[in-house]
């Protein structure tokens, strides 16, 4: 049987980190030389005992059925409380969507915000998967060279100069992978104001925010505006990379739209893990 791959699928580039991990695992399976694997960004220890015991208990008690497409209400409330206690930010649980890792959150955001031919401004260098999520939605990532002097982040001037007729928003990470740098709150506020002036969206990947130990950079973008979309994950904060648990915080008017997408795309998420 022959078939024609979609142009969208052919536009997607391999994730070379995972390709390297696959080949390294094959070498080990085939009795290759000992190696220290530095290819994947994850802790070398597993989730805390408390987490593992909670998952085992949920399985024993048969709590393995479908849940709400946005995640367990109790979990969303706990995440809301976490924002209040850690960052002093009020984030209603109704704005929190639990996802199959941060990657699923980014995919949902791109599908909710982008149409074929749209463009998204991103700093270069940036996390390579992010531009693939944009491409999978039929849009195009416009990479803007960012200098060390600018902490490898975009600023309002970048946005104003590069904004075009098909530009829909800005996607950045703070702290950034691979550079490790963050954008200062005042600079992000100016950038977001520039984006709002163009009626666009500001999407901030914050999965490494727990590794920011400087008060000037360790604050969530959600402190600045309820219109900012934030992506986060249990992977780095709680050593749960393989569990595929993440979440996104969206503006109130966007919550129902994302929920409808999640109902179709992620109803088979392993929901018992959300009972932790």
Where are these regions (language model features)?
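Short acidic capping loops at alpha-helix termini that bridge into adjacent secondary structure
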Residues: 90-96, 116-119, 166, 226-227
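A short helix-loop-beta submotif of the ANL/AMP-binding
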Residues: 136-142
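N-terminal small-domain helix-loop-helix segment of the aminotransferase-like
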Residues: 2-101, 108
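Helix C-cap/helix->beta junction micro-motif
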Residues: 27-31, 137, 197-198
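Conserved PLP-anchoring active-site segment centered on the Schiff-base-forming lysine
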Residues: 112-134
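Active-site phosphate-binding strand-loop segment of PLP-dependent enzymes
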Residues: 142, 148-216
């Amino acid at each position: 049987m022959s078939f024609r791959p979609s142009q969208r699928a052919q536009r997607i580039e391999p994730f070379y980190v995972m390709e390297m991990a696959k080949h390294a695992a094959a070498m080990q399976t085939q009795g290759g030389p000992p190696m220290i694997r530095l290819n994947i960004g994850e802790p070398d220890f597993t989730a805390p005992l408390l987490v593992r015991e909670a998952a085992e208990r949920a399985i024993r008690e048969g709590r393995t059925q479908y849940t709400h497409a946005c995640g367990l209400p109790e979990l969303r409330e706990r995440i809301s409380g976490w924002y209040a206690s850690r960052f002093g930010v009020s984030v209603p649980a109704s704005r929190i969507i639990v996802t199959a890792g941060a990657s699923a959150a980014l995919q949902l955001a791109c599908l909710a915000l982008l149409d074929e031919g749209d463009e998204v401004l991103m700093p270069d260098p940036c996390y390579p998967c992010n531009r693939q999520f944009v491409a999978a939605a039929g849009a195009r990532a416009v990479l803007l060279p960012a200098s060390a002097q600018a902490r490898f982040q975009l600023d309002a001037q970048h946005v104003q100069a590069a904004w075009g007729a098909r530009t829909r928003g800005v996607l950045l990470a703070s702290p950034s992978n691979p550079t490790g740098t963050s954008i200062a709150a005042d600079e992000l506020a100016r950038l977001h104001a520039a984006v709002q002036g163009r009626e666009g969206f500001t999407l901030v990947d914050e999965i490494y925010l727990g590794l920011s130990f400087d008060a000037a950079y360790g604050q969530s973008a959600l402190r600045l505006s309820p219109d900012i979309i934030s992506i986060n994950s249990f992977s780095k904060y709680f050593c749960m990379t393989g569990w595929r648990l993440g979440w996104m915080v969206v503006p109130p008017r966007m919550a129902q739209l994302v929920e409808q997408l999640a109902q179709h795309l992620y109803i088979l998420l392993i929901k018992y893990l959300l009972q932790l």
